[in-house]
């Protein structure tokens, strides 16, 4: 069985990780390729009240059920389909729904902390860090969380100052040293994206 190529894409919140991941997906649209978001593996908090959920630090490694992600990645590597959880950002907990992911040749794993856990890093063939200026990221995050995730401006700013920014410097930025490639400014860095896609193509063609 052909080994699944696993690509980790990380960086700070709103750094452009998803855009870089989608650029890879589009480049290899004729291949069996898929993307899994680490956000899907936020721990189930249905046992907590909504107010308690809003106080969770979602940028801390303990907010994620990374063991579950690792287990499902291994299942996919063995050629077995998995049911991936869906996270509800508005309710701050895991949805009761899942989606079916079949085995693929190329799997992108995207999220702010996908390089933080050594066990997860060890599953990856290519590790990418998207490096974007803090000011750009906070502006993007405000727009995204208000428009797409039903958040208020005050809640976004409070979360950024109390959790997002300090967690970035404590947990996310240090993982840059594990990256094989660092892409400044995300998908707008076409040279960086081209280098990545060229490397992926060479591996697939071996």
Curated annotation (Swiss-Prot):
GO molecular function, one term: cytidine kinase activity
Entry's Gene Ontology BP terms: CTP salvage; UMP salvage
Binding-site list for ATP: 11-18
GO cellular component: cytoplasm
Localization of this protein: Cytoplasm
Pathway: Pyrimidine metabolism; CTP biosynthesis via salvage pathway; CTP from cytidine: step 1/3; Pyrimidine metabolism; UMP biosynthesis via salvage pathway; UMP from uridine: step 1/1
Intrachain S-S bonds: none
Catalysed transformations (reactions): uridine + ATP = UMP + ADP + H(+); cytidine + ATP = CMP + ADP + H(+)
EC number: 2.7.1.48
NCBIfam families found in the cross-reference section: PRK05480.1 (NF004018), udk (TIGR00235)
Membership in a protein family: Belongs to the uridine kinase family.
Protein name: Uridine kinase
Species of the source: Lactococcus lactis subsp. cremoris (strain MG1363)
């Amino acid at each position: 069985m052909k080994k699944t190529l696993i690509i980790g894409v990380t960086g700070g919140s709103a750094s452009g990780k998803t855009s870089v991941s989608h650029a890879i997906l589009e480049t290899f649209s004729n291949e069996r390729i898929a993307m899994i978001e680490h956000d899907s593996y936020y721990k189930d908090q249905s046992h907590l009240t909504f107010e308690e959920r809003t106080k969770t630090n979602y940028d801390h490694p303990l907010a994620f059920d990374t063991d579950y992600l690792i287990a499902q990645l291994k299942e996919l590597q063995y050629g077995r389909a998995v049911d991936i959880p869906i996270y509800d950002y508005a309710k701050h907990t895991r949805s009761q729904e899942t989606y079916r992911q079949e085995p693929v040749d190329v799997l992108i794993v995207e999220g702010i902390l996908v390089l933080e856990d050594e066990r997860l890093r060890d599953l990856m063939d290519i590790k990418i860090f998207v490096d974007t200026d803090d000011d750009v990221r906070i502006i993007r995050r405000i727009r995204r969380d208000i428009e797409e995730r039903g958040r208020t401006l005050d809640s976004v700013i409070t979360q950024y100052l109390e959790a997002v920014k300090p967690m970035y410097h404590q947990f996310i930025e240090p993982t840059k040293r594990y990256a094989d490639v660092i892409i400044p400014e995300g998908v707008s860095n076409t040279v960086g994206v081209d280098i990545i896609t060229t490397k992926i193509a060479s591996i697939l063609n071996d």
